[in-house]
Amino acid sequence: QLASMVNALREEILRTPRDEAALAREVQAMREKMRKHLLPDERTEAGEFNLKQGAGGIVDIEFMVQYAVLAWSHRVPELARWSDNVRILETLGREGLFEQQECAALTQAYLTYRSAAHQLSLQQQPVIAPAGSYLEERVAVSAKWQQLFAPYTTDTTNE
């Protein structure tokens, strides 16, 4: 009974209407802050791709999915039903919020990255790949990120 109460509260919170533009700016700012903190410049400059934190990586997919849940669950309650990214991506495609092809590409990238990250972790290696790795996935993820958030990007040079 406690689990069902917690789940009901979770869904209620997720389905609260939000200002999409403000949410998008907050998500972008949080992602940039994480990237600066968790992705050392020397790694990027060394020609490596961090599967989790790199541009077009796991965390970018997770942030887009969570943005979609927070932004649109009040209109599409089904988005708040699941907590896993793959089922949420399926819902986004089914409901027409993302193109089906985009959802397939994001899901494939997410599962590919996670599998590689698990293999590296089992070998006690960092979740780093050569810079030329996963180019198709990185392009697809980065393109969707731009499409989703570019309309809400603000020019901070005048602030």
Feature-to-residue mapping (PLM):
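A nucleotide- and high-energy phosphate-metabolite-utilizing enzyme signature
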Residues: Q1-E159
